[in-house]
Amino acid sequence: MIDPYPLVLEPILKPKVWGGRRLESLGKPLPAGEPIGESWELADLGSTTASGGGGEAARSAIANGPLAGRTLHDAMDAWGAVLMGDAKPTASGDFPLLVKYLDAREHLSVQVHPSPEYAAEHSDAHLKTESWYIVDAEPGAELFVGFKPGVTKDDLEAAIRSGTVPSVMRSIPAVPGACHTLPSGTVHALGAGVLVAEVQTPSDTTFRVYDWTNEYDRPERELHIEQALECASFDEPPAPIVANGGSTEIANTEFYRMTALKAHCAAVDLPRSSGPLVMMLTQTMGAALASRSGGFQEIALERGQTTVIPADLTGDAILRAGPNTNAILASIG
């Protein structure tokens, strides 16, 4: 067996009508003349929907080491519990997280993912809890998360049918360094001018309720009114958590935990985890992953790269952080 080592993953770029060019600032090689909305940093999906992932499988390729050119799924097969620890694959045997960067040049559609009750009654629907970490935001950029106080299911239905959904939604400023966790069932949309790092459960089930067709002269797409009304939660979403200096826990769900790490010209011991540790390097002027014991060769990293550290190595990994280094750590298990 090939000895385990941290896996640097190749991005999978997704064209979106609402996308832009800001992913280039994260080192993504964007094709000319095409708006790119998403960079799938970690994906292990045997299939996707046409609107979400293009209708094809999405499996991240490995960029470094002896497994270069193979997929993360291949590494799961080869290393088993050495990679996964106590973390369980999905029901289809895939990695239990989907990790992305999103560049919203325009507003994204207002949508909702299946509620626990809906998913329990529909075998083809899956929960999708997600967390947005705001990497950057233009002045005045906003997020649409949940509803204004007092909004009811009847109010939502009337707003969907009259094309006035934004009027009943809660709009909040997009603040760099803030993390917003959206339990499945939260009606939401990213606003224009926001660049986010997103960690989520690997579901592609989405019900759309508003698509900004008039605001952006977009072609009309199907709305999923009945499903959305059945799934929508009218509870107040969790308050955002803002990352301060050092290490800040910014999300803690039943599916994953997230920590924001800020360092400047320092060697940082990464936390031990019972499952694999995913690291998104959102800002750096130079960084590397090293082994305290010498168990793997040092790996140079650049801004925007995403790495999976096998569970067995999490207590041994050190981040050598250059100037102004920010990272998001996502753990499972």
PLM region spans:
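Transition-metal
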Residues: 1-151, 211-235, 258
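His/acidic/aromatic-lined binding-pocket segments of jelly-roll/cupin-type domains
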Residues: 99-100, 108, 130-133, 171-172, ...
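Ligand-binding loop in jelly-roll beta-barrel domains
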Residues: 102-107, 116, 126, 137-140, ...
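Short beta-strand/loop turn elements enriched in aromatics
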Residues: 134-156, 247-248, 265-275
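Double-stranded beta-helix
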Residues: 144-167, 196-238, 323-333
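Short acidic-glycine-tyrosine-enriched beta hairpin
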Residues: 169-181, 190, 290-313
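C-terminal amphipathic alpha-helical segment
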Residues: 206-276
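Short beta-strand segments in beta-sandwich/barrel cores
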Residues: 267-268, 284-290
